[in-house]
Swiss-Prot record:
SUPFAM superfamilies: YozE-like. InterPro entries: UPF0346, YozE_SAM-like, YozE_SAM-like_sf. It comes from Streptococcus pneumoniae (strain JJA). Signal peptide: none annotated. Coiled coil: none annotated. The lineage of its organism: Bacteria, Bacillati, Bacillota, Bacilli, Lactobacillales. Transmembrane segments: none annotated. Belongs to the UPF0346 family. This is UPF0346 protein SPJ_0886. It holds the Pfam family YozE_SAM_like.
Length: 71
């Protein structure tokens, strides 16, 4: 079974980095409602679009998701 997106993303946390992946990881860590136990693209994408307390470039999210799938 694949790790959840959140679990994988947490390995990329780095407050000193300006990379989109590190930025999203830090924002997701601070967001209590971020979906932590899913590997479903639509669920995470919908959360980012409709419910997140932060804004994030969805084009960057798509690239990060692709990297997640390839890990």
């Amino acid at each position: 079974m694949r790790k959840s997106f959140y679990t994988w993303l947490m390995t990329e946390r780095n407050p000193k980095s300006n990379s989109p992946k590190a930025i999203l990881a830090d924002l997701a860590f601070e967001e209590a409602a971020f979906p932590k136990h899913t590997d479903d693209f639509d669920e995470v994408s919908r959360f980012l679009e409709e419910h997140a307390s932060f804004s994030f470039n969805l084009g960057d999210f798509d690239a990060i998701w692709q990297e997640y799938l390839e890990h």
